[in-house]
Amino acid sequence: MTRRMRRKHWMSLLITIAVAVFAYGQQQGWFSAPEKGVMTSQPGLYAIDHFVDGDTITVDMNGTKETIRFIGIDTPETHKPNTPVQCYGPAAAAYTKNTITAAGGKVRLVSDSLSTNRDRYNRLLRYVYLPDGTNLNQRLVESGHAFYYPYFPFTKKDTFKQAEQQAIAAKKGLWGACTPTPSDDGGYKMEETQAQAGN
């Protein structure tokens, strides 16, 4: 075999290996671009330590208990000091608990580049994903268990707003059981007179 033939042979072999590595990397997601505006802050799945209410949970994060506040949504109150249990609050809390429990009791947490890392109560602000990739924040809005929360910046605002509009039109969840009042700043609120309705 001449030197030229040997060189062509090795080049062909290297190209074949490179193609194989690239194909494997594509399959494993090595070259996938991250979702625009969103980064994974805690890779892996975290076990639920406690369900606080519909939009707040605590997780065991490598031996540390962290409270997680769902980004971009707000569920009716069940445990807020000096606030009565609001219409559909218990239903929203039960939906979050039952959905996560049915999925194995573990979640993946994703931060948002437009959002702060923690809120004023030192809770981590996160999108909460089920193991199958379902965004639970969005599902709560779609199913009428939560309001879209427009008061702070986050990348999925338009998606959540559209989900809320569809839930309103279909009278899903709290939109059928309660009578939320539009607030001056683009969101909705529950009047205290509705506190015990629809629980």
What residues fall within each predicted segment?
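Small beta-barrel nucleic-acid-binding modules, primarily SNase/OB-fold domains
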Residues: M1-N199
